[in-house]
Amino acid sequence: MLPDYTDLLIKRFENPDEVRTFEKGRFELIKIGGMTIGRATYEPGWKWSQHVAPVAGTSLCQVEHVGIVISGQAACAMEDGRSYVMKPGDIFYIGPGHDSWVVGDQPYVSLHFLGAEKYAHD
């Protein structure tokens, strides 16, 4: 059993506080230490503008992200056309106004330290 004290708290994504699911993906949230951390898991073929936009109600993701890629690869394209492929170990900042999609045939997993509470939410 994991400790649950006021000065020490350990949580795991195997038991998240919240799970947001959508076609080809899921976003798990852990609330700890006054912040919300998210774990994104997307299947090959996932694309934000196709699979999350209907939930968010916008054509591009308007959430600001800071995170790290754990496995797989994803491309990110900004509204002005700039794009980048994110790979395992990349620590990223992505501003509002972007699309993203899985690159290749491996699932993509990343941790999000900024923006998690607003992601895949109306």
Feature map (PLM): residue ranges:
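A short hydrophobic beta-strand segment most commonly corresponding to one strand
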Residues: 39-40, 93-94, 99, 104-122
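Glycine- and acidic-residue-biased ligand/ion/polar-headgroup-sensing regions
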Residues: 35, 54-80
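A short, N-terminal "cap"/entry segment at the start of jelly-roll beta-barrel domains
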Residues: 1-41, 49
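Short acidic-glycine-tyrosine-enriched beta hairpin
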Residues: 78-97
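Conserved short histidine dyad/triad with adjacent acidic residue
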Residues: 39-60
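Short beta-strand segments in beta-sandwich/barrel cores
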Residues: 47-48, 72-77, 100
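Short, acidic/polar N-cap/turn motifs at the starts of alpha helices
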Residues: 17-19, 26-27, 37, 64, ...
